[in-house]
């Protein structure tokens, strides 16, 4: 299922410092492949706006879990950024589009 408005509000407030980033292994690999630091990741997250929002969709493994997808840029590279709420932390997925 998909929708055209974010499921989660205030992602920037939840992810306000490097210590707040909770990353999947896939996200860590994507960040490393792009050549980003965690500081770069945090900067991208803090600069996201509704103009970057792409879609919300349910997770393949569990249709009750929503994921918000944003498109952004970093140093001329187009990024696909996905957030998912799990307990009290967001899991962040980064990859090049």
PLM regions: where:
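Intrinsically disordered, low-complexity and often Lys/Arg-enriched segments
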Residues: 1-4
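Compact soluble domain cores
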Residues: 10-64
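Basic/aromatic recognition patch in beta-strand/loop cores that engages polyanionic ligands
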Residues: 60-84
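Enriched for short, Lys/Arg-rich terminal
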Residues: 77-80, 84-97
């Amino acid at each position: 299922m998909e929708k055209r408005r974010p499921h989660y509000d205030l992602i920037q407030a939840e992810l306000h410092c490097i210590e707040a980033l909770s990353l999947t292994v896939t996200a860590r690999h994507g960040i490393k492949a792009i050549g980003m630091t965690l500081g770069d990741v945090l900067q991208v997250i803090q600069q996201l706006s509704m103009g970057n929002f792409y879609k919300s969709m349910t997770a393949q493994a569990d249709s009750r879990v929503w994921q918000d997808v944003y498109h952004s840029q970093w140093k001329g590279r187009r990024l696909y950024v996905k957030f998912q709420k799990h307990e009290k932390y967001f899991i962040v997925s980064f990859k090049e589009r």
